[in-house]
Amino acid sequence: MKPKVRITNIAIKNFKNVNFGELSFVNNRKNFKASILGLYGQNGSGKTALIDALELLKYALCAMEVPDKFADFINVDSDSAEISYSFDIRLNETIYPVVYRLTLGREIVQVDGNAELFIEEESKYKVKILNEEFHCQTRTPDGKLRMGRMIDTKSTATVFVPVSKYELLVGRGKEISTDLLVSKKLSQKTAKTFVFSKDLLNAVRSNAANQNAGDEKKTETAHYLALLEALVEFGNIELFVINTANSGLISLNTQPLVFKIRSKENEAK
């Protein structure tokens, strides 16, 4: 059965004019299939910040380069911004809670040239991904399930921590470890996600395929891989974000593409 993904909560910290804000997407009062249908508030209340946070999620899940405009979205009183996304992922009629946390930073990018005055005038900020965390239900040594840290990329010496989860997902091969370290540094350099990168996903897929059939580790690795792939599919196929720039074009009816939908009955006439 195709996995179903729903965003259940977003927490924003030091992003645009929001020092801290949290929004639950779950409707607990009435048994509706839909949750949030609209977001209302006065000017400056953070409505656009939420849309920009969803746009950032789209870039992350699709492993696309985060535009430099997000460097300007970091609060002026902070060096970084943190956004946490909570999901419910349905796999085989079972719902698994998942949390993806993204920390953004910025650095000054200097244009080519060695003239001091020229550099000061033309310098601008470039966005960079400082850290990514992926939390889901993990199994403890006594067999119980609890929310735990699956992937944390803050370490510069290793691909990610905890080491036990790294060895479960990727294995202990030195060659793949070196390749992933290079991929991680390139992802950080180009402001792309590493958790949902093709290199890491392929490494997990390869490790899962090479594990012995019937092994508990193979089943566990396949489960975590299914969670990651469900989010990737959700970001590429199901998540659509229309920001203020796009909504303006739609309102003005100035989209470059014009199309008409005709029913089969009208075509028959």
Predicted features and spans:
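Pre-Walker A-like glycine/lysine-rich segment at the N-terminus of P-loop NTPase domains
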Residues: M1-L56
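Hydrophobic beta-strand residues in large extracellular and virion-surface proteins
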Residues: I10, L23, I83-Y85, Y100-L102, ...
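A general secondary-structure signal for short beta-strands and their flanking turns/coil
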Residues: V5, V18, A34, S78-E82, ...
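Residues that cap or initiate secondary-structure elements
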Residues: K16, R29-N31, L91-E93, I108, ...
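Short acidic, glycine-rich loop/turn motifs
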Residues: I12-N14, Y85-E93, C136, S263-E265
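Conserved P-loop NTP-binding catalytic core
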Residues: I51-D112
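Electropositive, glycine-dotted interaction segments
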Residues: G105-N266
